[in-house]
Structures are given as structure tokens and as C-alpha cells.
Amino acid sequence: DCPSGWSSYEGNCYKFFQQKMNWADAERFCSEQAKGGHLVSIKIYSKEKDFVGDLVTKNIQSSDLYAWIGLRVENKEKQCSSEWSDGSSVSYENVVERTVKKCFALEKDLGFVLWINLYCAQKNPFVCKSPPP
């Protein structure tokens, strides 16, 4: 059984949180709510996406367009290896982090079932998922 206020679906527990956080803070928050908790992961070819979309649609404020999910592009091993004209190496990480949309959210269009990539610093409501206690 899931804790009070959480919804059960195919052996996992889910909860929508309206408070807006950036992606990393939302992920940390989910891990503090329940043992094994994370921002929601969604199997693409399953009814889980409809369940989660429904959960968000029923609970989100009408003005909100996005809800974070637990997907983030990790590009650590693909650092660009360009060089400056004087031969010194370039690291783009400090530039890229702020300018590339690496974190994924559910998008309001079509009922929160489609994913969109956003800036990770953007603050959005989110869905946590955890195994039952």
C-alpha cells in the first residue's frame, strides 16, 4: 500500500507536488519523501504515461504548463574538444549548462503525456514515484 496522499499504479506509488522547484531540487525532494523515491520515470509503451498524465491533469493549477519528470540529458563524456587559436583547450561545460535544455517535463498540450526539454533551472511542479514502503 502507498502512503496517504499517494496513488498506486502497477506496484509503484506516485504523487504530484504543486510547489515549483528546479529539476535538481525536485529530484532531491522526491528522494526525501520516500525510500527509493525519484522524479517519475515513465515507460513509453505502457498505460503508465496515461496514468501519470491523468494524475497531473487532475491536480495541477490551470496556469501551469509543465511538470518535471525524472529524465535529464547527461553529456559528461561528450565534452567538446575544440581548441582556441593559441592551442589551449576549451571546456564548454560552464556555458552549456545554462544554455542547453537538458531536463524533461510533461507538457500541458494533449494532457501531459508528451515530453518537452526545458532549462533545468526553470521552476515547475513535478511528480514523484517510489516503490511501496
From Swiss-Prot:
GO terms for molecular function: toxin activity. SUPFAM superfamilies: C-type lectin-like. Disulfide bonds join C2-C13, C30-C128, C103-C120. Pfam families: Lectin_C (PF00059). Residues 9-129 form the C-type lectin domain. Keywords: Disulfide bond, Hemostasis impairing toxin, Platelet aggregation activating toxin, Secreted, Toxin. Is a standard reagent for testing vWF/platelet interactions and detection of the defects in von Willebrand disease and in GPIb-related disorders such as Bernard-Soulier syndrome. The keyword Disulfide bond applies. One of its GO terms (cellular component) is extracellular region. Snaclec that binds to von Willebrand factor (VWF) and induces its interaction with GPIbalpha (GP1BA) (via the vWF A1 domain), resulting in platelet aggregation. Heterodimer of subunits alpha and beta; disulfide-linked. Botrocetin and vWF form a soluble complex. PANTHER family: MANNOSE, PHOSPHOLIPASE, LECTIN RECEPTOR RELATED. Belongs to the snaclec family. This is Snaclec botrocetin subunit alpha.
